[in-house]
Amino acid sequence: MSELIFEKSVKGHKFAEAKLTVPEYKLDSKYLRASDAKLPEVSELEFVRHYMELSKRTHGVDNGFYPLGSCTMKYNPKLNEEVADLPNFTNIHPLQPEHTMKGCIEAMGDLGKKLGEITGMDAFSLQPSAGAHGEFTALLVIRAYHEKRGDHARNKILVPDSAHGTNPASAAMVGCEIVNIPSDKDGNVDIEELKKTVGNDTAALMLTNPNTLGLFETHIKEIAEIVHKAGGLLYYDGANLNAIMGRLRPGDMGYDIVHLNLHKTFSTPHGGGGPGSGPIGCKKFLEEFLPVPVVTGSDGSYKLDYNRPDSIGRVRNFYGNFLVFLRAYAYILTLGSEGIRESSGYAVLNANYLKKKLEKEYDVAFDRICMHEFVLTLEKIKEETGVSALDIAKGLIDDGIHPPTMYFPLIVHEALMFEPTETESKSTLDFTAEVMIKLKKEAYSNPEKLHGYPYTRPIGRVDETKAAREPVLRYKACCCCK
């Protein structure tokens, strides 16, 4: 492992300093540090070489296949980056007077309208900064709706056992009790269990469709009817919208409120903590509760509306991650309605193609046509060879393939979840299948080798348990460096 940038520091090494072009201003001494900050002192060349070296160790969509299930790691067109980098957008400050940023407001308003068309929702808020933030915001809206109606007993959120872990976490954050709904033998929500569970205390059911097993909830209309009849609302986790966009709308399935991941479905770069964007959309009867300000208007005449007495208030400063909005807006405008429909079709086609190639050698968790992703179970392989899903996933790294999602959903033992996305070629999928088949053969012929992968990368097998339990999140200088 190479040295940290702090360890490469040499006193006196520095960049060429730009000349001051404005009058010098001296801060009052009470605002100054008592001692110099321990920042690394390196030259520009040392700086560039250090981060170039680190970049070679980073795997992203631009340099390799990234089939991380439930994450939609599709290619991000560089045109979107050009739009987000236009000076007329980047030089605007959110505290400017509204009349001086009409173009930005129009972009937000039109994006919200287009997201509404795609999802079948009547109104949108772009404020939430990530998927889980969108979940949390949507649940605040649901809570406000029930409270305004005096329905204070509705404090239970129903969550399928295959759901993303953020669903129950978000429900807990708004003070609700989480009730687990099991899956049936086909990987769908168990309808009979749902009927037994709903009642006067049901606030909402949080449901991804396709679900996190990559399967379409075929009884969705019946599910919506059951929840609504009990007085609850149906919430759409938009993590898997990439499988149906342009073909089927959550609003038409009976959903009342949705969150989307612009950083997944609408092709804006993600990973490494952000930036993300998790807008929420809702039906007309929930619009009054959306965070302020709401962008209102149409056809180029948009404005920011703060006059919303029943709004849940702001959920973040300013208006959200604006440059992420622009990337998603450019993506939608570039593809158009037909392109969006094609994208979801190819996403489903690619997933089914790869699944078909692998199911001859691996057990598929649910033997059905999948949507945009599928889940393998390596339980039998582990029982017979001792090789785990983790070992197979790490083996992919040496062939330049990012591991799929491991051990999720939790209801599938030794799970590997693949999501190829629509932007990958047949040759990439064929190569991935070849590597997976090779690794299975090694599991039976040389299991010890599998336990050691990866071998050819700068960093080998990491102790992930230790990293999770004893994280080192900042640089600590040795005693001799103090």
Curated annotation (Swiss-Prot):
Swiss-Prot/TrEMBL cofactor(s) = pyridoxal 5'-phosphate
Does the record bear Oxidoreductase in its keywords?
A: yes
Q: Which reaction does it catalyse?
A: N(6)-[(R)-lipoyl]-L-lysyl-[glycine-cleavage complex H protein] + glycine + H(+) = N(6)-[(R)-S(8)-aminomethyldihydrolipoyl]-L-lysyl-[glycine-cleavage complex H protein] + CO2
Identify the Gene3D superfamilies for this entry. 6.20.440.10, Aspartate Aminotransferase, domain 1, Type I PLP-dependent aspartate aminotransferase-like (Major domain)
Protein keywords: Oxidoreductase, Pyridoxal phosphate
**Name of the protein in its database record:** Probable glycine dehydrogenase (decarboxylating) subunit 2
Q: Does the keyword Oxidoreductase apply?
A: yes
Where does it sit, as one GO cellular component term?
Answer: cytosol
Positions carrying N6-(pyridoxal phosphate)lysine: 264
Entries under InterPro entries matching the protein:
Aminotrans_V_dom, GcvPB, GDC-P_C, GDC_P, PyrdxlP-dep_Trfase, PyrdxlP-dep_Trfase_major, PyrdxlP-dep_Trfase_small
- EC numbers on record: 1.4.4.2
What's an example Gene Ontology biological process for this entry?
Answer: glycine decarboxylation via glycine cleavage system
Q: Which Gene Ontology molecular function entries are recorded, alphabetically? A: glycine binding; glycine dehydrogenase (decarboxylating) activity; pyridoxal phosphate binding
Its quaternary organisation is:
The glycine cleavage system is composed of four proteins: P, T, L and H. In this organism, the P 'protein' is a heterodimer of two subunits.
Q: Which NCBIfam families match?
A: PRK04366.1
Q: Which Pfam families match?
A: Aminotran_5, GcvP2_C
